[in-house]
């Protein structure tokens, strides 16, 4: 008996009338989002799209980058898997896909239905058929004329930028003009003159965003840490000859607190005028709270009263003349001058030797005796006290020079700097020693005793007397008070506490205060050692100092001439390669045997620690830091690890005048732009091992929906990266689609050419030659409907396979370790490589790394990131460990594919493997065919397919909203009817979107329900009727099952049981 499925279409649900409750679906116009078209882009009143029942959508003005990379949490949300019913019917198993959704809905208990709110209006579904409902967004196409309209405007923007800065960057302008000419040439010679955006390919875009490949790469600039500066007129211009010093060393008056204006300047004036009074301490705390970003949890806030009490005692350790005069050197200089005045005439650079005698000598020694009686310290240069001091200082100076790599440097002795390569014990040294003793003695008379927990009086005396300036002394008193109160720490306090506010203020006035506290007061603080890490990596969005910053970058590429890939790895390998080989043959666990990939080679490429190319070599005679490195800047290196690959360490300079430019979209938001010549597409950048020193820059720009980006700095960078290798994006589609199209085609062409070289009759090309040929390959773009299509077509072309594969089913067989090897062996070429005893086909099996790690959504534990790669050495077939991350945020080919360029010696192409090498080969195949991979359960991106589609449509021709319902049937055989609900629609898009399921056995076709009626493309009968519904005339759509039987409320559960 035929059954019927009822759909009621009404303007608004007024009450739970019987006519409504008996219908399976109710479609209303309540809450419908108004259409809005802006400059040819069809959209909505986006304010009305926030937080509607249905998809879990956040505010429309959130950036697309934040939307994709941040986890979105919605109350009452749960995941759904739109295609599971069809997959169960088709494959009798669950197929993990990319279009999962997070749904938020609400039960309407009166209607006994479930409410969702798509853009077309509120909809109510009966519970038994609701689980098979999902939402879809169509990214509409834009006219090509509008897509191409930005080309001339970009050139105009950079011309105006040059005028604004009054600096013409000839290289940049030349690049932009080259790009314009290349794009126009492609449009004229290859692309259609009229039409609409060719394709969007949301699935591939989605995957490339997940894999961090939707964009380009540019080098980190490793610039001198902001704590350091280059000493002028010292050393040479080359980075290796620089002399640098800490910015906080020397005159503190370069600080903002001496600028003459501003709150920090006003606070300094008050401290110097009023000392550390209660009111001054309160103002110091209030200032620090405005800027404090501490997020610690340390309990027990120090009170104002306790701080006043501490300071009352600690300030007595500050020499009186520092308080009175307030000048840096007053106390020491005044005392020293007075002492020198009473001395006999002497050569102060000679050793301190003097005997008692008549006249002036007699008076001098009388003064020394008087000093001893008055202060209890014998400073007679002929007595043991001075000689003991000479011995102690000499040992200290010798130790300091040894620690400085044998180079002379300066050490603070008795409050002054002394060179380590001079003989200690001169008259000057003796006077400085006596001066320091006098300062300690004079201060000690005024010191108040206090029961400190951690501080020691003798250290406080020595420390305060060695400091420069009363301001520094007072601020350090506060820091020391906190150190003592919290018994040995000055960090980890709660935000807004008195302690955290004081430390913030001290840090702003004296950024290097922690080091000085440790060195001068003998306290124990945990400090990050940065003296050997002088350089830090920065990107184009980093902040740079006004006066400019200096450092270096890594550049790399491939040279064409004079290189041969048919060579073995030789002397560049260490003994660890043999150790690993033996460990594998003995059956030891891979994770226990494998080491850092760098350990298998003698050379150091700095891929793990690129910020440490230049290290501290110690200090010069002026206490400036000198640099050392085994590499030279501006020298091109050709590593024996690779063939045509080169890299160079180049000096860089980032200045506001040259590098600061405005953003195209936010014209008042400046950023610092690096040299275009270094930019690389991700596909090409990953061919080099130094991709670890580069930054991935994505193209996720603008709001997550409702904003059209015509051009942006990120898109310029992408275009410049392509232009560097002779390629341009296509302009027969929108910029989002064209950016992914060129990237996926480059990857496909590169991988096919690289691994096809291992076929017996193929050309043995270097990467440089391959890159040239690939640029020709990608002039005509291949179309890949999904990432899996790209993945399988690449695999088939490498193994010369022309079968028509069922994409989803075959992909899942490759993913499953139970069926992976069996599926791979269906490729004749793969099976031939497995069975062959020759070296060259064996090396082609390195393609297994691509097969395994380039699957979509795969997750690899970073703790097990080192995996095997086969290489040909002078000793035969061997294996090394490679890093599949290579310091990147995601899985990257750059950690292993550079090693594939070198193949084997020409004489070994037909060489048969030994028994041990065959054992290694079998182990290698088993390793990758049984390597278990986790599907990435990435909470931040796994449920954002429709949000991404909406962003794409917003940047092209607009967005259409659909609700799709699958109605399963059970007789005469299992099948499904697709019912699609929309306000307006394009039936061709729906048919294309659902084609894979509409063409399967058991499909009953689709019925499109929209405002104007229905479009029936199914085998069932559908009628449009009128129904009088409590005072209003509504539309009722009845779908008759005919000879088919719609599933009952338990059918979905029965279908799911088949997947277990």
Swiss-Prot record:
Family: Belongs to the orbivirus VP2 family.
GO molecular function, one term: structural molecule activity
Keyword Coiled coil among record annotations: no
S-S pairs: none
Keywords, ordered alphabetically: Capsid protein, Inner capsid protein, Virion
Entry-linked InterPro entries: Capsid_VP2_Orbivir
Primary role: The VP2 protein is one of the two proteins (with VP5) which constitute the virus particle outer capsid. It is the major target of the host immunogenic response.
GO annotation, cellular component aspect: viral inner capsid
The protein's name: Outer capsid protein VP2
Subcellular location: Virion
Keyword Transmembrane helix appears in the UniProt entry: no
Pfam families in the cross-refs: Orbi_VP2
Gene: Segment-2
Major localization listed first in the record, in broad terms: virion
